[in-house]
């Protein structure tokens, strides 16, 4: 087996993602409004373009919930879904799904690892009739189904799901270096299959992993990419999740999980966003300045991703009050360009040169404030300016001393009556 691939045959791997138990089927999901494209697609869930017509997908009969408001459908598809892959679309809280439907010609892949599915280079006899690809999704769930059509009345088409590829993680966020699972599974009649995981980013694409179930081998496996292969469960669903051991900024982008069967193939798409919060250091750590001299503050922001970061300076005069812009006490400031490290993260430095120190500047607090998309709130690192040769308590020191004195006074008053009470009682008895 190719290096870098671990096949984890975990029958329970899919249990956290599986659809409702077939013994107690849930009510059918609400009908889904769809855009029916006129052009014939290229197969596998790729739209073929052309004009769009309003259509409606119905699942398993009449649903209790009416469809979302919209134009009157010109075509209604009554879809039979034996594996329940479309059921999660109606589970509350329900987000109106997006849906695109286009006719297609069933076909297998042209990659070398998918050719053994059709050694005679001919489509199977079951590939006759009309075929469509339905791509339906919400922020929490995405499914692409290959539909085989049957007879129907005017304006109505009866279709059955022949293959469905789904994901419970259509959009993911991963920290640099932290393992991440890109969930994918498929439902289909028992047969040999070929799996392909492809990564696309900034116009470039690569096959991360390919797996052939007939040989249980991976003809293609990129280092760091692992296949979590689940066994077929009672609902006919097989998990084919991709695990990235140490994602880096270069792993950000679009991931395509494609499943090839003898009668055709389809795929689902996932988006991975990589992030890393910045580390912030401020120098010097101790800011002691002689009267009449200036100092320079440097704020170093490192190890962050993505690129955009904002660095600002703030000052609290005398260490009290609210933070304000230090423009009255800063002569000059500058910010370096971005520098990229070997792991793909970025760093940059901001500096501020202060005006010559005066007695009234003693105790000023300067802060470097960093804002970044990976931070829940801005990060602040501060330093206090101390004027050499200047003594005397600051407001914070006075407040602290007052609190200590208050506590000590209360403690003495609590202890003193206990010690003095016997003497007072003796005097009264005399």
Curated annotation (Swiss-Prot):
Gene Ontology CC: MHC class I peptide loading complex
The entry's keywords: Disulfide bond, Endoplasmic reticulum, Glycoprotein, Immunoglobulin domain, Membrane, Repeat, Signal, Transmembrane, Transmembrane helix
Residues in the Cytoplasmic compartment per record: 418-430
Pfam families: C1-set, V-set
Signal peptide: 1-15
SMART domains named in the record: IG, IGc1
Biased composition (Polar residues): 101-111, 322-338
Spans traversing the lipid bilayer: 400-417
Lumenal-side positions: 16-399
InterPro entries: Ig-like_dom (IPR007110), Ig-like_dom_sf (IPR036179), Ig-like_fold (IPR013783), Ig/MHC_CS (IPR003006), Ig_C1-set (IPR003597), Ig_sub (IPR003599), Ig_V-set (IPR013106), Immune_Resp_Modulators (IPR050380)
GO BP term, pick one: peptide antigen assembly with MHC class I protein complex
Recorded topology in the membrane: Single-pass type I membrane protein
Cystine pairings recorded for this chain: 34-99, 299-368
Molecular function GO labels: MHC class I protein complex binding; TAP complex binding
Glycan-bearing residues: 78
Chain residue ranges for the region called Disordered: 61-128, 316-342
Subcellular location: Endoplasmic reticulum membrane
Record domain Ig-like C1-type: where: 139-273, 278-382
Complexes and interactors: Interacts with TAP1 and is thus a subunit of the TAP complex. Interaction with TAP1 is TAP2 independent and is required for efficient peptide-TAP interaction. Obligatory mediator for the interaction between newly assembled MHC class I molecules, calreticulin, ERp57 and TAP. Up to 4 MHC class I/tapasin complexes bind to 1 TAP.
The record's note on its domains: The N-terminus is required for efficient association with MHC class I molecule and for a stable interaction between MHC I and calreticulin. Binding to TAP is mediated by the C-terminal region.
Classification via PANTHER family: TAPASIN
Function: Involved in the association of MHC class I with transporter associated with antigen processing (TAP) and in the assembly of MHC class I with peptide (peptide loading).
Name listed for the protein in its UniProt record: Tapasin
Species annotation: Gallus gallus (Chicken)
Gene: TAPBP
């Amino acid at each position: 087996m190719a290096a870098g691939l671990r096949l984890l045959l975990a029958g329970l791997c899919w249990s956290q993602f599986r659809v409702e138990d077939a013994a107690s089927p849930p009510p059918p999901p609400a009908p889904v409004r769809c855009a029916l494209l006129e052009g014939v697609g290229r197969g596998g869930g790729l739209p073929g373009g052309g004009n769009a017509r309003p259509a409606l997908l119905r699942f398993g009969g009449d649903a209790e919930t009416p469809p979302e408001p919209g134009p009157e459908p010109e075509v209604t598809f009554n879809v039979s879904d034996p594996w329940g892959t479309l059921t999660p679309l109606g589970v509350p809280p329900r987000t109106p799904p997006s849906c695109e439907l286009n006719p297609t010609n069933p076909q297998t892949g042209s990659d070398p690892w998918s050719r053994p599915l059709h050694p005679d280079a001919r489509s199977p006899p079951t590939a006759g009739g009309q075929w469509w690809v339905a791509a339906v999704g919400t922020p929490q769930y995405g499914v692409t189904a290959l539909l085989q059509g049957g007879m129907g009345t005017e304006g109505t088409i009866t279709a059955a799901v022949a293959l469905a590829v789904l994901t419970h993680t259509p959009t993911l966020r991963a920290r640099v270096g932290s393992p991440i699972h890109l969930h994918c599974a498929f439902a289909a009649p028992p047969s040999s299959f070929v799996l392909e995981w492809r990564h696309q980013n900034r116009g470039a694409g690569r096959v991360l992993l390919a797996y052939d179930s007939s040989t249980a081998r991976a003809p293609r496996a990129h280092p760091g990419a692992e296949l979590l292969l689940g066994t077929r469960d009672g609902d006919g669903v097989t998990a084919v999740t991709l695990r990235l051991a140490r994602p880096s900024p270069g792993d950000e982008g679009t991931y395509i999980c494609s499943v090839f069967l003898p009668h055709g193939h389809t795929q689902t798409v996932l988006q991975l966003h990589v992030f890393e919060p910045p580390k912030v250091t401020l120098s010097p750590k101790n800011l002691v300045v002689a009267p009449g001299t200036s100092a320079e503050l440097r704020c170093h922001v490192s190890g962050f991703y993505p690129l955009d970061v904002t660095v600002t300076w703030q000052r609290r005069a005398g260490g009290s009050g609210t933070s304000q812009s230090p423009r009255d006490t800063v002569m000059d400031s500058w910010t370096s360009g971005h520098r990229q490290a070997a792991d793909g993260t970025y760093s940059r430095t901001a500096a501020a040169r202060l005006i010559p120190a005066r007695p009234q500047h003693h105790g000023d607090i300067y802060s470097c404030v960093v804002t970044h998309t990976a931070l829940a709130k801005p990060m602040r690192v501060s330093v206090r300016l101390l004027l050499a040769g200047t003594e005397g308590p600051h407001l914070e020191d006075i407040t602290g001393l007052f609190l200590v004195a208050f506590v000590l006074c209360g403690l003495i008053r609590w202890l003193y009556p206990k010690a003095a009470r016997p003497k007072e009682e003796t005097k009264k008895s005399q």
